[in-house]
Regions:
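Short acidic loop-to-helix transition motifs that present clustered carboxylates
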Residues: 210-212, 233-236
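Catalytic beta/alpha-barrel core
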Residues: 226-231
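Disordered, low-complexity tails and leader-like regions
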Residues: 38, 236-238
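Ordered alpha/beta subdomains of enzyme catalytic regions
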Residues: 1-223
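Conserved small/polar residues in nucleotide/adenosyl-binding loops
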Residues: 240-242
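Short beta->alpha linker loops
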Residues: 99, 232-233
Length: 242
């Protein structure tokens, strides 16, 4: 399942004002834009490339709807001949990218765009947004998975993510980084990855005691039972109750 939203206006205003500048000056040379980073995150010695799938979906659906053009007209920044051009806009360039899950290093291009400058300018912001965020999450996940020394790591970041998209695509990126499952059900549906989970502290607190809560949950899900031990006494009775 793909993300069917039209994200064409997911860009900085200056990309569009520069596009109009190129249009008005009748200049649209073919250029090369490289997306890269200067420093590994988390003091890491490497990073993990991610975000390519969403980037491809974004490029495939890149077009200005009538609603988009009407909105841009309302800003009073754009002339009618340029807005007419946008209605017929399609991306015609070439994109080269490192496969997701690849180990990458500073100043190494993750995505290379070869296109007329008006087109390359437009896609710059969204591609950086998509690739930077998801590569960050994949890198963090990879480091956690490595530190776990072979124990399975699950992704539970949705409730702490910076909004729905960060949770949805961050979960996918964590899987690329080596996690064995995610708590995000929509990520599981959209990208066909395993969904896994435990129970909440509220489940424990809704029963007379912790042992009863554990027992009832284990009876319900004998083949998929992961118990949360840090509601009351993490290193004491909680472990004994298991």
């Amino acid at each position: 399942m793909s993300d069917s939203r039209n994200l064409t206006l997911l860009t900085d205003l200056y990309e569009l004002t520069m596009m109009q500048g190129y249009f008005k000056n009748h200049t649209n040379p073919t250029v090369v834009f490289d997306a890269f980073f200067r420093k590994n995150p988390f003091d890491s010695s490497y990073s993990i490339a991610a975000g390519l799938e969403q980037a491809i979906e974004y490029i495939k659906d890149l077009h200005f709807s009538q609603e988009d053009v009407d909105y841009l007209r309302s800003t009073r920044l754009f002339d009618e001949d340029f807005l007419e051009y946008l209605l017929n806009f399609r991306f015609s360039g070439d994109i080269y990218a490192i496969p997701e899950g690849t180990v990458v290093f500073p100043r190494e291009p993750l995505v290379k765009v070869i296109a007329p400058i008006m087109e390359a300018q437009l896609v710059e912001t969204a591609l950086l947004n998509i690739v930077n965020h998801q590569s960050l999450i994949a890198t963090k996940a990879s480091r956690v998975v490595y530190a776990a020394g072979g124990d399975g790591i699950m992704e539970f970041g949705l409730r702490r993510a910076q909004g729905p998209d960060a949770g949805l695509y961050g979960a996918r990126a964590a899987m690329i980084g080596g996690c064995i499952g995610t708590s995000c059900v929509l990520t599981g549906q959209m990208f066909n990855v395993p969904v896994k989970g435990t129970h909440a502290h509220s489940w424990i607190m809704s029963f007379p005691d912790e042992y009863t809560a554990f027992k009832k949950y284990a009876e319900l899900y004998p083949d998929a039972c992961i118990l949360l031990v840090d509601t009351y006494d993490t290193l004491g009775l909680s472990l004994i109750h298991i």
